[in-house]
Amino acid sequence: MTNIRKTHPLLKIENNAFIDLPAPSNISSWWNFGSLLGICLILQILTGLFLAMHYTADTTTAFSSVTHICRDVNYGWIIRYMHANGASMFFICLFMHVGRGLYYGSYTYMETWNIGVILLFATMATAFMGYVLPWGQMSFWGATVITNLLSAIPYIGTNLVEWIWGGFSVDKATLTRFFAFHFIFPFIIAALAMVHLLFLHETGSNNPTGISSDTDKIPFHPYYTIKDILGALLLVLALMTLVLFSPDLLGDPDNYTPANPLNTPPHIKPEWYFLFAYAILRSIPNKLGGVLALVLSILILVLMPLLHTSKQRSMMFRPISQCLFWILVADLLTLTWIGGQPVEHPYIIIGQLASIMYFLLILVLMPMASTIENNLLKW
């Protein structure tokens, strides 16, 4: 008798995706982040659902409803902090996942890569809207500043901003719609993740060498299921350490002050995972220019397959490109640091140099290094 998992219409989809899937025998721990992102998403949806049961999306009660969750709801504090810090873990995994794709040339799977970029944008939008919901000072002013950036769009900018706000300022209508969108987006992300996997399974996984692994495949289960479980345990360990020992480490103290439209915080800044993009935005004196640079800093990922000039797919055997890749990582860490600093000397110039370096590395230096390495192969 044929095994039910191979014949049942639903089970065979699961089987072909997670059990009998032929996987390269040499994929490293850098390939764990896809499954970790799936776990993060499920965790965020579950904790978010329980938070939504007690949250009220109204300007007068939003802040106190979050306080009520932390003080009066059974284990509300742990659900709230798991959700807030779960977002941080989500972005850590996202950055690692994208970094892995850049290093090992996974972007040559164009469809998978482009869906991934859309997923990144969707996740960033969701996280931004979620940050507004507690209706603290940084929630309110973050929403005001970031939505206001759209006013830089010529001709329709101001109308667009007021349309998003649902009025002439960030108010009750804004909060309500942000809550609605924040609730629905994770399900859209889950659907996109399935499409992401669908495209990936059309080609099969890449591997550290960047060479076809068709000659040496192993079944996903049990080899990579057990490996993913280990990754998941480490993820949960890191998350729970953060939640139980220093839940506010990555948050902003200003968000424990209820939103006040009449009082601007001294330093308006987003959550840590947006700081690199925020630094790029701030380093350009022109408003529209800053907004364009902000969008392009992420959208540049779409160009990666076009900028690939190397004869080799992976960076595994390309020392010059490796060096530039790690300089890019250091540059992004510098931008993250700058994004959290006040706009004053010397931070302004450091931010501008780091922003120039970011685009220069991706658009000019890395393709040049690849060409040099191609020529070195001839010697």
UniProtKB/Swiss-Prot annotation:
Q: Detail which positions bind a ubiquinone.
A: H201
* Record's cofactor remark: Binds 2 heme b groups non-covalently.
Q: Which residues cross the membrane?
A: 33-53, 77-98, 113-133, 178-198, 226-246, 288-308, 320-340, 347-367
- What highest taxon heads this organism's lineage? Eukaryota
Where heme b b566 binds, per the record, is at H97, H196
- Which GO molecular function terms does the record list? metal ion binding; ubiquinol-cytochrome-c reductase activity
Q: What does this protein do?
A: Component of the ubiquinol-cytochrome c reductase complex (complex III or cytochrome b-c1 complex) that is part of the mitochondrial respiratory chain. The b-c1 complex mediates electron transfer from ubiquinol to cytochrome c. Contributes to the generation of a proton gradient across the mitochondrial membrane that is then used for ATP synthesis.
Note, other = Heme 1 (or BL or b562) is low-potential and absorbs at about 562 nm, and heme 2 (or BH or b566) is high-potential and absorbs at about 566 nm.
Protein name, UniProt field: Cytochrome b
Annotated source species: Cephalophorus harveyi
